Design a protein with these regions (language model features):
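Phosphate/nucleotide-binding beta-alpha loop and adjacent structural elements of enzyme active sites
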Residues: 1-233
Length: 233
């Protein structure tokens, strides 16, 4: 059951992260690279933020493309009252993956929500005993049901589930020009694909790797990778 503001003990922390994205998980290099895309003429009208957490990436991108409309996708139901508080109507709460209707254990930590995933983080912050059982959805199914517009830019930061979600997004991906994907370099989330295999899969979906590890808070663990839709020969 979704919580209210009064039920969330870390509300003020969520606000702090939202208001200071460069200090909480979005490196300056990431934002600078987006500004570079804009300078090169890329002006998206629709952006999908997959793994939106407190919306801090949305806030950062509004400084780059203020005219774009950003749609939030987040598995953590606790974020619903947070989004409502800020008047963000374009959001979906649900566990995205490559199938519809599959039960998965979603491991979560109220204080460190950035690591929530159905691939449990291999750290002391996450316990095998603390999870919610959620039913998966594909991005294609969600977007079709809601009738939302298709994106030109899509970002995925979902702690190891990136490629699963992409496999369930083949229709949406037909319209995506640029793709930002956080990929892992070590077994940080148990069972998640590592970067090399992830890159191969993303390339098979019609994208080429443009910038490898273009931004990271800790490159030993993971980094952001930038892909562009392959141009027709």
């Amino acid at each position: 059951m979704a919580k209210s503001k009064e039920d969330l003990p870390y509300w003020d922390k969520y606000v702090d992260i939202k208001e200071n994205p460069e200090h909480f998980g979005i490196p300056k290099e990431h934002i600078s690279r987006m500004h570079q895309l804009k300078e090169e003429g890329f002006i998206p009208t629709v952006i999908y933020d997959i793994g939106s957490a407190v919306g801090h990436w949305k806030v950062a991108m509004e400084q780059v493309w203020p005219e774009a409309r950003t749609y939030l996708f987040e598995a953590n139901e606790d974020m619903a009252p947070f989004y409502d508080h800020y008047g963000w109507e374009d959001y979906h709460i649900g566990l995205l993956s490559d199938t519809d209707g599959t039960e998965r254990n979603y491991y979560y930590n109220e204080q460190n929500i950035g690591g929530n995933s159905y691939y449990k983080e291999n750290s002391a912050a996450y316990s095998s005993d603390i999870f919610r059982v959620l039913n998966t959805e594909t991005l294609d199914s969600v977007v079709a049901a809601k009738g939302w517009p298709q994106p030109q830019l899509m970002k995925l930061d979902v702690q190891g589930a990136e490629c699963d979600i992409l496999k369930g997004s083949t229709k949406v991906l037909e319209n995506v020009e640029w793709l930002i994907v956080e990929l892992q370099h070590i077994n940080y989330n148990d069972g998640a694909l590592l970067a090399a295999d992830s890159i191969a899969l993303i390339q098979s979906l019609g994208f080429e790797l443009i910038d490898e590890k273009f931004a990271s808070s800790d490159v030993a663990i993971d980094a952001d990778y930038l892909f562009r839709r392959k141009k027709d020969e």
